[in-house]
A protein has these predicted regions:
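Polytopic alpha-helical membrane-helix bundles and their juxtamembrane interface segments
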Residues: 1-92, 97-306
Length: 306
């Protein structure tokens, strides 16, 4: 293992490397487990499993990079006057995995795509601002910190209020599952700016302490959260099947009923009325002025004209 200079430098030592390797192992093991569980389910019930497995897969790659002493640089710390090791690989991880974590929750709530977009956009801005602040060598780093905290406040409001309304509208066990998971993730995520303020910000804790703190938060936010999603699988599946039978479809972040054949009304011309009649279906009545007519078709509980 390569030796980093320690005089005048705040860098990771042996305890930190051990934490990185252990965290990598947990992430990789969880990725295999999540994917194995997901593949046992019907295709229509796999979206949460795929999302959760992808989260820990990306995190495992990032932790492997950091455990192998990569993905880092040294930046002058304005507080303390020394050089501090900053892991940019951590931010690359977060810019992919935190939107996926939010997507996991927002899929559960089946919230409108507009709501999902501004919540996820605030998250991406928060991560980028954290990176900019971490590598900044002036007092302006605290400006990035303040803006990042504001973005996290926006995320919290979106999860606790806006997305919660969508989850409550679904009813059943989903609203309770969402409420618990949203509260868990919202509270947990506020631990990140606290660690950032002590590490990249004020430079008052060691690099090893920073590694341990971030690893603990990541394990809680990705591994534990992932197992919570897996454990809630029967409730989620039962709710989806019930909604499908009611003609509401499998709720999606894009459209609450895009997967339901009962809730989609299509308009299509009937080119050959004679062929319709031979199949035992009603034929088109000619429209006004000799134009093509229409046929009544039952779509779920509604009757429309195609």
């Amino acid at each position: 293992m390569a030796q980093h200079p320690t005089s005048g430098y705040v860098s990771t030592t042996r305890p930190g490397w051990i934490v990185y390797w252990v965290t990598f192992g947990l992430m990789a093991f969880s990725a295999v487990c999540f994917m194995a569980i997901t593949l046992t389910k019907p295709q229509r019930h796999r979206k949460h499993g795929y999302c959760t497995a992808l989260i820990v897969t990306i995190a495992s790659v990032a932790y492997y990079a950091m455990a192998s002493e990569g993905g880092a640089t040294y930046t002058y710390a304005i507080h303390g006057g020394n050089m501090r090791q900053i892991y940019w690989a951590r931010y690359v991880d977060w810019v992919f995995t935190t939107p996926l974590l939010l997507l996991d929750l927002l899929l559960l709530a089946a919230c409108p795509i507009g709501t999902a977009m501004w919540i996820i956009a605030a998250d991406v801005f928060m991560i980028i601002l954290g990176l900019f602040g971490g590598v900044n060598t002036h007092k302006f780093k605290w400006g990035y910190y303040a803006m990042g905290c504001f973005c996290e406040l926006i995320i919290s409001i979106g999860l606790v209020f806006n997305a919660m309304r969508s989850a409550m509208a679904r009813g059943g066990g989903i609203s309770k599952v969402y409420a618990g998971m949203a509260a868990y993730l919202t509270i947990l995520w506020w631990g990140y700016p606290i660690v950032w303020g002590l590490a990249e910000g004020a430079n008052v804790i060691s690099s090893d302490a920073e590694v341990a703190a971030y690893a603990g938060l990541d394990i809680a936010a990705k591994v534990f959260f992932g197992w919570m999603i897996m454990a809630a699988g029967p409730i989620i599946t039962a709710q989806q099947d019930r909604e499908y039978k009611e003609g509401k479809g499998y709720p999606s972040i894009l459209d609450a009923s895009i997967d339901s054949p009962l809730s989609i009304t299509q308009t299509q011309p009937i080119a050959n009325p004679a062929a319709q009649a031979t199949r035992g279906l009603p034929t088109m009545e000619p429209g006004a002025n000799g134009t093509a007519g229409s046929v009544p078709v039952e779509t779920g509980n509604l009757q429309t004209v195609v």
